[in-house]
A protein has these predicted regions:
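Histidine-centered, metal-coordinating catalytic motifs and their short helical/loop contexts
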Residues: 102-130
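Amphipathic alpha-helical interface segments
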Residues: 1-108, 135-192
Length: 192
């Protein structure tokens, strides 16, 4: 159980990193937007789309079902909230707090699932030909998902006896701030 959860939590850390990178690039103020537009506008536009789609894919991945059919009646276990919840339940460790966080994570999934299924993971013909906008949601809903994700990891850590890990902030050497500094001629360009 502990190894499974630690591997799951690493996926959650990666989701946070992807979210932070996208936010730090594209939601950090006009000076940074102008710098991106003056250096490589096409690249940054494409990177924004890639990061959003990848974030949606990862958020759906951790909220997929506990197993996936692979043919001939066989299944593979998924490293997901549902799989961990099932393991916790079997051991009598599934608390109300963990259930509540699971429900919060799955509420967000409902908002983005069509985008994953019809545009990101599959090329749905109707979506491609009619330019249907899928997966739209408020920033507050994305932030709530991340909050549920952190609370879920903390609550599971507690019941299985794993040291909690705060991964709410993922910046460090070589991050977006250093990129903007390099693009800005060596001068630090803080978010606004």
């Amino acid at each position: 159980m502990k190894d499974t959860f630690i591997a799951f939590r690493q996926q959650c850390e990666w989701i946070q990193t992807c979210f932070d990178t996208n936010r730090d690039l594209f939601d950090s103020g006009l000076p940074r937007k102008k710098l991106m537009a003056s250096t490589a506008p096409g690249f940054f536009k494409e990177l924004n789309i890639i990061l959003i789609e990848y974030y949606i894919l990862q958020a759906c991945k951790i909220t997929d079902g506990p197993t996936t059919p692979v043919g001939r009646g066989e299944t593979r276990e998924n490293l997901t909230v549902a799989n961990i919840d099932g393991m916790l339940s079997a051991q009598g460790l599934l608390t109300d707090e963990i259930r509540s966080c699971s429900e919060g994570l799955h509420r967000y999934r409902k908002l983005i699932l069509d985008a994953r299924n019809r545009s990101i993971s599959h090329a749905d013909k109707e979506t491609a030909l009619t330019y249907i906008e899928l997966g739209w949601h408020l920033k507050s809903e994305a932030l709530a998902f991340l909050d549920y994700m952190h609370k879920y990891c903390d609550a599971v850590s507690e019941v299985i006896g794993v040291e909690p890990l705060d991964f709410r902030f993922s910046s460090g050497p070589g991050d977006v701030a250093d990129l903007f500094k390099a693009l800005n001629g060596g001068v630090y360009l803080p978010p606004t």
